A protein has these predicted regions:
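N-terminal secretory signal peptides and thylakoid transit peptides that target proteins
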Residues: 4-22
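A ligand-binding cleft/hinge motif common to bilobed small-molecule-binding domains
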Residues: 95-99, 217-236
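A bilobed periplasmic-binding-protein/Venus flytrap-type ligand-binding module shared by bacterial periplasmic
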Residues: 137-142, 180, 249-262, 280-281
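Mature extracytoplasmic/periplasmic domains
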Residues: 256-313
Length: 337
């Protein structure tokens, strides 16, 4: 996924409206009785998009949701392991899931055949529902007359101290992915310098609201979350894909070991990987599909993936060293909100 070296700054453009014609519905597994309990760290737009497809394509498949941060929900699943309450967890990066893999059921969904092998766990413990790019969400009205940054290095300018917000990496896989990537790209000294400018929020959703409402000049987040503000017409909001490279990470869904809903849980899992669900996610929540049979440009105006320089990170290493990294991060004493 290497691309050319270029900095992208997305301003408001015309966002395509309406759903494109969907392909004929796949033969989803037949549902039995029992409500599927979905633990999800995703935003309302993403969850509603998937539930809308479920209602249309599988009206007898009932799904209830419990929301929270990815780390919080995974620890809840761990605490419930003796008597599972969740059927599916959606979603987190592999660098976070690796520490909890004993809680997941191996399941080779028929729908996963449309995904590249790299987006499926080799033992089918998790499957990518979509792919994220890391961006800086910028509110130009809060830059104090300074030009918008173009690089990661620009973000360590002391003038931006206290003006950049990020979620807590202990509770947010988004924040962990971002900070791990910065550490690998800029080194420990670069990460420490960036940390001096950051304010940490306990909730990932606060990052978006704080920038959107002008409380902070910048927020470090995933492309899909920030682009919703561009698509919504906030002309002061733009997205930065840093020139040195940004990070790409798949977002995964898992089947919880001992899922109470049984066959229904697998039916919901299959539906979440369907072409219909991924198109709905793309058009309503701006999440790049994991399937290889969807042309992003036909649905939303996001930069082509091969036009963005992507800095590769080792997800297995990130998972193995997660606790060690978080201890080092906490030693920086970053400001909190």
């Amino acid at each position: 996924m290497k691309g050319t070296t270029m900095t992208h700054l997305i301003d408001r453009r015309t966002v395509l409206a309406g759903l494109a014609g969907m392909a004929a519905a796949p033969a989803f597994a037949q549902s039995a009785s029992g409500t599927v309990v979905l633990y999800t760290s995703n935003n309302a737009q993403s969850v509603d998009a998937v539930l809308g497809v479920a209602k249309e394509k599988q009206p007898n498949l009932k799904i209830s949701t419990i929301t929270g941060g990815s780390g919080q929900l995974l620890r809840r699943i761990e605490a419930e392991a003796a008597k599972p309450q969740a059927d599916i967890f959606w979603s987190s990066s592999a660098n976070t899931l690796g520490a909890f893999k004993q809680l997941f059921e191996s399941y080779a969904s028929p729908a996963a055949s449309a995904l590249p092998a790299a987006l499926r766990h080799p033992e089918n413990l998790w499957t990518a529902s979509n792919v994220h790019l890391v961006v800086a969400m910028i509110n130009k009205n809060q830059l104090g007359g300074k030009p918008a940054p173009k690089t990661w290095k620009d973000l360590v300018d002391p003038a931006f101290k206290g003006k950049i917000i990020i979620a807590d990496p202990a509770n947010s896989s988004t924040a962990f992915t971002i900070l791990w990537g910065v550490d690998k790209l800029m080194g420990p000294d670069g990460l420490k310098a960036l940390a001096a400018n950051l304010t940490v929020s306990s909730a990932a959703s606060t990052v978006l609201r704080a920038v959107g409402q002008g409380e902070f000049a910048m927020g470090l987040t995933f492309e899909s979350n920030a682009y919703a503000y561009v698509a919504g017409g906030q002309r002061e909001i733009s997205l930065l894909y840093p020139a040195e490279g940004t990070f790409s990470t798949p977002e995964f869904q898992v089947l919880v070991k001992g899922a109470p809903a049984g066959a229904n849980a697998k039916a919901a899992y299959d539906l979440m990987l369907s072409k219909e669900a991924q198109i709905a996610l793309l058009e309503n929540a701006f999440r790049r599909p994991s399937r290889s049979d969807i042309d992003v440009s036909k649905h939303v105006e996001l930069p082509a993936i091969d036009s963005v320089k992507v800095f590769a990170i080792d997800e297995d290493e990130a998972a193995a060293k997660r606790d060690e990294f978080l201890k080092r991060w906490q030693s920086y004493g970053t400001a909190t909100k």
